């Protein structure tokens, strides 16, 4: 979603700085910020930035994510998103790609703890550029981050495992309640 919850200016500013490199950026989606992003692309003549607002199926989304070298999560100042875990991060991990997460909250901490990518300070374009260049020059690190993310999903976040944990939690509360009364 191209909404204020995400800092797309961070990506635009990185694309401006890296426009003479072979690094390409893709922003895919729809939302309130689509026109702003398109205007910035035109204003700065960003040939290295593709904006695609066409609808795609879930299968196509998976393919697009798998074809990407690195996946970005530029969190904005939304407390709700910064202190929750957007499913987008789990999708990124599921396809086994490294993540660069601009977050001062739980999202960045999660990426760091699962060793599935790099956490940078929110809004810090220089850290984003440095992280992009670091991953570009280190395919082995990209693979390690991607593998770690995928393993995290397989070990902890399948429907089966979540269902079992939820069942145990429900049993715990049922027993707790029966002991109270």
Regions found by a protein language model. Give the residues of each.
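Short acidic/histidine- and often glycine-rich active-site loop of Leloir-type glycosyltransferases
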Residues: 83, 104-114, 118-119
């Amino acid at each position: 979603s191209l909404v204020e919850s995400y800092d797309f200016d961070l990506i635009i500013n990185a694309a401006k700085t890296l426009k003479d490199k072979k690094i390409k950026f893709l922003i895919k989606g729809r939302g309130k910020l689509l026109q702003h992003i398109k205007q910035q692309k035109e204003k700065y003549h960003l040939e290295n930035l593709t904006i695609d607002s066409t609808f795609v199926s879930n299968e196509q989304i998976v393919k697009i994510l798998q074809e990407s070298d690195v996946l970005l999560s530029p969190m904005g100042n939304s407390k709700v998103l910064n202190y929750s875990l957007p499913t987008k991060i789990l999708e990124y991990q599921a396809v086994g790609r490294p993540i660069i997460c601009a977050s001062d909250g739980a999202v960045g901490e999660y990426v760091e703890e699962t060793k599935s990518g790099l956490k940078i300070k929110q809004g810090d374009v220089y850290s984003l550029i440095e992280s992009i260049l670091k991953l570009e020059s280190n395919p082995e690190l990209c693979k390690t981050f991607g593998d770690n993310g995928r393993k995290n999903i397989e070990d902890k976040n399948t429907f089966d495992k979540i269902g079992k944990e939820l069942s145990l939690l429900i049993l715990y509360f049922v027993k707790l309640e029966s002991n109270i009364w």
